[in-house]
């Protein structure tokens, strides 16, 4: 028996006790950050995102289509890519009726119109899964209806976010969305602002590796008014 085999044999015979699973979520529940109210938490999230050039519009379930149209027209868009297989995609298309913005369905295989997609599409529109207050972040799930390219390639990304799905921290989002129990989707991504990069001279540039503009339509619950958030938000 070689020295290696001898060592392995001794290890196998040893009375090894199973290691106790660390109480990760209990630790973060105890040590995690919290805010005095929903409004304060939303203000913190908004301040973190606006600090990196994110545009946020506080909207309601009924007002977001109108605000979406106004924001899109304000950017002078010629077209916008919509996930028409979703309810919010259909609502967004209806909001653009009689406007100068052409709604384009995201329904073709990317290889069949790659040149047009990368060269001629002004904006994309998607939903989000949830938000993370501490870091000023949105979590998005890629799906056949809303693939990653919908929010990555166009220079402007409109994102619809239901603030009822706001979590304090990342671990709260993992727990609340049951990512452990249900399995994490193959493509989950966290967005904290438009694409940005810096060269060796530390010159900050937006849009180098993704959208240069991120516009969030943040849907508020009925008991919170947009006016509650605009002051110092």
Features from the language model and the residues they span:
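The feature marks the mature, well-folded catalytic cores of soluble enzymes
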Residues: 1-233
């Amino acid at each position: 028996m070689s020295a290696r085999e001898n060592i392995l044999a001794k290890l196998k015979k040893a009375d090894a006790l199973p290691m106790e699973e660390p109480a990760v979520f209990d630790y973060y529940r105890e040590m995690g950050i919290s805010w005095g109210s929903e409004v304060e938490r939303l203000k913190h999230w908004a301040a973190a995102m606006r600090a990196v050039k994110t545009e946020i519009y506080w909207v309601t379930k009924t007002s977001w289509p109108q605000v979406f149209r106004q924001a899109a027209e304000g950017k002078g868009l010629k077209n916008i890519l919509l996930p028409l297989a979703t309810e919010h995609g259909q609502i967004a298309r209806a909001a653009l009726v009689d406007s100068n913005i052409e709604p384009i369905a995201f329904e073709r295989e990317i290889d069949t119109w790659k040149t047009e997609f990368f060269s001629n599409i002004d904006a994309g529109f998607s939903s989000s899964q949830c938000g993370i207050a501490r870091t000023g972040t949105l979590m998005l799930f890629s799906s056949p209806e809303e693939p990653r390219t919908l929010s990555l390639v166009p220079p402007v990304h409109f994102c619809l976010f239901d603030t009822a799905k706001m979590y304090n921290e990342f671990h709260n989002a993992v727990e609340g969305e049951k990512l452990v129990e249900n399995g994490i989707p193959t493509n989950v991504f966290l967005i904290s602002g438009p694409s940005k990069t810096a060269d060796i001279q530390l010159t900050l540039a937006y849009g180098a590796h993704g959208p240069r503009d991120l516009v969030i339509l943040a849907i508020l619950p009925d008991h919170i008014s947009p006016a509650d958030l605009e002051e110092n938000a």
